[in-house]
């Protein structure tokens, strides 16, 4: 399905409501994330590469917070012939409906089970790969460790978690510098000062980024044997953890 241009915050609002993944956002999401998240295309492509390396025959692959299915599509193209099943989960009905249309545009022998629900309620089992692509940051902080435990318990030995997140930096000058670079990235992609300001206000109470150290500690506490950042641009990073 073709994505419209993101102009959701182009006109001034008297009061900016909290960001939610509703039908309006789903309709412009491809354009929004491409113009807002530096390196997003590279992350999606590399998730497919990682799936090719880590997906084991007859295993399950989970895309938790699948949105329109970009990561699922990238994975599905790279795991054909392995009898894998992909479980793609999102709590937005609008996202799931558009994801279904996007997936149906391509023929594949790898089945995808679409689930509209809370990722905290999903049973994870026999997983060779679990993807959290800019999802954890929207989950209440007190639920993040328990979700990681569920993922760890459901992964096969040697299984891979891909975790992409916006990061917060405790060093104030580093935080402000990387934040400024990100805002310049959005300006270069055509967003106005009004759009940037209103979008930021809408996300203020919804998205709660962690520091890289918080991610490291949480993953180590859960028992993952290896962890690394494989991609970072400004204050956006993608990490891998191996069980």
Curated annotation (Swiss-Prot):
Residues that coordinate or bind S-adenosyl-L-methionine: 40, 65-67, 90-91, 118-119, 133, 200
Annotated PANTHER family: CARBOXY-S-ADENOSYL-L-METHIONINE SYNTHASE, TRANS-ACONITATE 2-METHYLTRANSFERASE-RELATED
GO biological process, one term: tRNA wobble uridine modification
Keywords: S-adenosyl-L-methionine, Transferase
Catalyzed chemical reaction(s): prephenate + S-adenosyl-L-methionine = carboxy-S-adenosyl-L-methionine + 3-phenylpyruvate + H2O
Quaternary structure, from the entry: Homodimer.
InterPro entries: CmoA, Methyltransf_25, SAM-dependent_MTases_sf
Pfam family, one: Methyltransf_25
Source organism of this protein record: Shewanella piezotolerans (strain WP3 / JCM 13877)
A GO molecular-function descriptor: carboxyl- or carbamoyltransferase activity
Annotated family: Belongs to the class I-like SAM-binding methyltransferase superfamily. Cx-SAM synthase family.
Entry EC number(s): 2.1.3.-
CDD domains: AdoMet_MTases
Domain of life, per lineage: Bacteria
Function noted in UniProt: Catalyzes the conversion of S-adenosyl-L-methionine (SAM) to carboxy-S-adenosyl-L-methionine (Cx-SAM).
HAMAP family: Cx_SAM_synthase (MF_01589)
This protein's name: Carboxy-S-adenosyl-L-methionine synthase
């Amino acid at each position: 399905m073709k994505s419209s241009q993101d102009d959701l915050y182009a006109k001034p609002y008297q009061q900016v409501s909290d960001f939610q993944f509703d039908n309006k956002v789903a309709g412009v999401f491809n354009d929004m994330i491409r113009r807002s998240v530096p390196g997003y295309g590279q992350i999606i492509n590399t998730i497919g590469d990682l799936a090719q390396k880590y997906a084991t025959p007859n295993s399950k692959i989970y895309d938790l917070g699948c949105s329109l299915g970009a990561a699922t599509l990238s994975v599905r193209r790279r795991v054909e012939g392995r009898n894998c099943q992909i479980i793609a989960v999102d709590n937005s009905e609008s996202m799931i409906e558009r994801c279904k249309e996007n997936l149906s545009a391509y023929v594949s022998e790898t089945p995808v089970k679409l689930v509209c629900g809370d990722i905290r309620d999903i049973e994870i089992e026999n997983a060779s790969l679990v993807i959290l692509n800019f999802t954890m940051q929207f989950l209440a902080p007190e639920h993040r460790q328990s979700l990681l435990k569920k993922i760890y318990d459901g992964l096969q030995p040697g299984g891979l978690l891909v975790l992409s997140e916006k990061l917060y930096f405790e060093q104030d000058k580093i935080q402000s510098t990387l934040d400024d670079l990100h805002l310049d990235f959005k300006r270069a992609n055509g967003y106005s000062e009004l759009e940037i300001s209103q979008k930021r206000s809408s996300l203020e109470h919804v998205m709660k980024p962690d520091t890289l150290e918080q991610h490291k500690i949480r993953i180590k506490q859960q028992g993952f044997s290896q962890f690394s950042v494989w991609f970072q641009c400004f204050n956006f990073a993608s990490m891998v953890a191996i069980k």
